[in-house]
């Protein structure tokens, strides 16, 4: 009930600091239960990439961005498609800005049985070009072998769904793409069937 007031108060901490794109807070099933983990202790300035990939945060966030920054990063939806992962824009913003970490639940929500989270595979099938482009970016940016392998496998799945030729040569690591290809092939015909 006090989310707007809370955001305005936290905003004062970063007003005028051009290194911040906005605030990253939590979503929860109620005011006391986050949809995932709490923010890591002691974190103030963070990128969304580091929050998830380096600090182990899992779950949904409430994002409040400066409007003038969002306008500079339009969503790159492929022709004929209707969706691209929001994180494709958030991760690009990360390259130039931090977010103020806020360990407060600002949004209360619940997953729908037919929502994006539950139907990520069918969404990737309907929007394969945007999917493989996003996963290629994530594979290139990943810093651990596990993360690079996961994202490379999903990039290859996206290429298969889009009938994109030359996927291995387009991968950030061709050697890893060759190793991940069998995994991607299995995923394509099981999870993404």
Specify the residue positions occupied by each region the protein language model found.
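Alpha-helical elements of Rossmann-like donor-binding domains used by nucleotide-donor carbohydrate transfer enzymes
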Residues: 2, 6-9, 88, 92, ...
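Conserved donor NDP-sugar-binding/catalytic core segment of glycosyltransferases
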Residues: 2-37
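Alpha-solenoid repeat scaffolds
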Residues: 14-17, 145, 166
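Conserved nucleotide-sugar donor-binding catalytic segment
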Residues: 27-118
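Catalytic core of nucleotide-sugar-dependent glycosyltransferases
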Residues: 106-112, 119-146
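Structural motif
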Residues: 142-149, 174-180
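Structural register within alpha-helical repeat arrays
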Residues: 148-158
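Membrane-interface aromatic/basic loop that binds lipid-linked glycans or pyrophosphate carriers
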Residues: 159-193
